[in-house]
A protein has these predicted regions:
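Short, basic/aromatic recognition patches
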Residues: 1-15
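Alpha-helix boundary recognition
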Residues: 9-10, 55-56, 100
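Short, basic and Ser/Thr-rich N-terminal targeting/leader segments
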Residues: 11-13, 26-29, 113-116, 123
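Short secondary-structure boundary segments
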Residues: 66-67, 124
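Charged, gly/pro-rich active-site loop segments
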Residues: 75-168
């Protein structure tokens, strides 16, 4: 099941990331990313609200997916993660290379100026894999820990659409 999550991450190139503002309100932003397995890399401006939010509180929520006309085709991820700046020069360089390779338009802009940009990583803690081809509302949950990845049995929730309980 971990490979299914990695496949979805590898298929898309844009994610929504939600951070917590100082006033407690969530702030969601779209960012380009690259991944190595379940480890996500992205670049932000040091002057951005999301950078300030992450420096203050590393907890983030991430969504990866795309719009579908047919709900039965939804395949997406909802992720709880901890984000932080990549400070190790070798890992930072690796992250930049992955991002620029995955996003050629960014590569044409040149390398990020590290005085103004921060290379970030997000360590996934909980990964919910949405796969509605297995049934409307189908979700498998992965818990990622230092010892490995554990899967929680699938949760199916048709939201009342298929059970006849939906109100018109």
């Amino acid at each position: 099941m971990e490979q299914k999550a990695v496949d979805i991450l590898s298929k898309y190139r844009l994610m929504a990331i939600a951070t917590l503002r100082p006033d407690g309100w969530p702030q969601a932003t779209m960012v380009s990313y690259a991944n190595e397995g379940l480890l996500l890399y992205f670049i932000v401006s040091r002057a951005s609200q999301k950078y300030t939010n992450i420096e203050r509180d590393s907890r983030v929520s991430i969504v990866v997916g795309r719009d579908f006309e047919d709900p039965a085709q939804i395949k997406a991820l909802s992720i709880a993660a901890n984000a932080s700046e990549v400070r190790d020069p070798k890992q930072r360089e690796r992250a930049i290379e992955l991002i620029l390779e995955r996003h050629p338009a960014l590569a044409r802009l040149g390398r990020p100026d590290l005085e103004h940009s921060a290379v970030m990583r997000a360590y996934c803690s909980i990964v919910t894999i949405l796969d509605y081809s297995k049934g409307f509302g189908h979700a498998d949950i992965l818990t990622v820990a230092p010892g490995g990845v554990e899967m929680t049995p699938a949760r199916d929730d048709d939201w009342g659409f298929l059970s006849g309980t939906a109100e018109a």
